[in-house]
Structures are given as C-alpha cells and as structure tokens.
Amino acid sequence: TEMISAKGLIYKSPGTAELFATCPEDGPVVVQLFGSEAPFMEAAAGQLRDKGFVWFDCNMGCSVPKVARTGSGAAMCKDIDNALAVAEALIRAAGRGRVGFKLRLGWDEPGRSPAAETWRVLAPALEALGAGWLTLHPRTAKQGFTGTARWEYLSELKALVSLPVIASGDLFTAEDGVRCLAETGVDTVMYARGALRDPAIFKAHLDLLAGREPEVADVATLLARIREHARLARELSTEKVALLKMRTIVPRYIRHIEGSKQLRADIIACRSWDDFEKALHTFEAGKSSSE
C-alpha cells in the first residue's frame, strides 16, 4: 500500500482508510506503516489485523521532510533504541516473520552525523526481533534521491543477515532490476519511481527473468493502458479522487513519448473526465494524422 500513518489510522484522519482500500486481485497485500511511537504502531497493526491484513512493512527509509520531521521514516535511524522498540511492538502485534522493514544507509555520511551507517546495527537487530525481510535503499537520508544508489551495500546486507533482502534505489527499468539481482545477490527488487514511469515494468521484469524479450508498447497500446488505468481508478475510488490521481500519474508514464509535452499539459489541466478523454483523443488524432 501507500504509506499509512499509524497515528492517522488510530485517530481516523480523513482519507487514511482509502490508503489501504484493496480488492481480492491485489493479494497478497502488504500494509506499509510509518510512525515513531511504539504504542500507536502496535495499535494500528492490531486494528489492521482485525480487518484481515496479515503482512506489514515499516517504513524506516522515507527521507521526505514532512515525514522525517516527526521522527518517522529515515529519521528513526537517529534513535536506534526507539526504532527497535517500534519494531518489537509491530512484530508483537503482527507475528514473527510478518513484518518487513525499509532502511536507508543512515542519516548522513560518516563524519557528518552520529547516525551514519546505522543499517549495520539495525539489520541484525531487526532479524533477531523476528523481522520477515529487509529492504535497503543504499543512499543516506540526507541524499534523498540525489547521487547514485550504492548497490555494493546491498551485497553486504545480504551477507550480514539470513533474511530475504529486497533492493531499492535507481531501478528505473526492468533491465536495471535484473542487473541489480545479478550484481548484488539480493532476493528481489522493489520498483518505485521506475514503476511510476512504466506500469508494465513488472511484466517486463518477469519476461527478462524467463528469457523473453519484453514487449515495447507503441502509442496505441500505451493509450489503451491509460484508459484501462482510468477505468480502474474510477471503479475503485471516487470520481474526484480518481481524476486527481490520474492527473498526477499519467504525465509520468507518457514523458518518453515523442510529442507528448502538450498531452502532459492537457492532462494536468483536466477538470473533468470529459477533459481527460478529450486530451487523449486530441493526441491520438494528431498521431494518426502524422503517420
């Protein structure tokens, strides 16, 4: 799921419930929680278990300022004792082996912060507590998404623990993901920004692993995918929320199409579903006439 605030869930903040809304086809679903207070995290996991959720992921890697300012996300590496107290509470609520943890390398580089390379302390401690798996984005929190993900740390983590290790960071294409598997020995990868740019990245990944050449979507296929995405968004959400999401998502995965600058602008400016379809149709007609 998207990141869900444990406190927001307990206090029933507007919109929180929609973040873990799902359907049978989604299974198995892993609920991604964040928060820096053990009682709230334990209570949130307990509530979600009562709703039938089984798997959880604790985000200790998000470096977005509004999350880190609360002591959550990547800021948890600044207080190892509290991070482990939160982990213990979550595992107590969900069960051993049912909670994963996302980590960064640390808050900053050695010499710049006392919370440097905290992953080396957290990883084995989380394994001892009963974590089910670990995900590492091999950048510091201060880096955000700048610089280059240092995949060599993924190999080190894999050697340090016996848990499944998931790689994150600079996985923009399926080829990146498969190369990361080969170079680091991790168990699998987690696509984030790469999936926002190309929703078909997961199928392409499986194709490459199976020795098949991934399909390269032409414009007609991509537009059909956008319309299907819009249909599902409207079916699974309110009309207003679905349109807002499509206005945010679609421009990312049409960016590589030649001549799509105006389409991106038109999608972002949409105020209704009629506007949305008109933008697609105008672009489609323009492409057809130029071929």
Predicted regions mapped to residue ranges:
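Flavin-dependent oxidoreductase catalytic cores
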Residues: 1-291
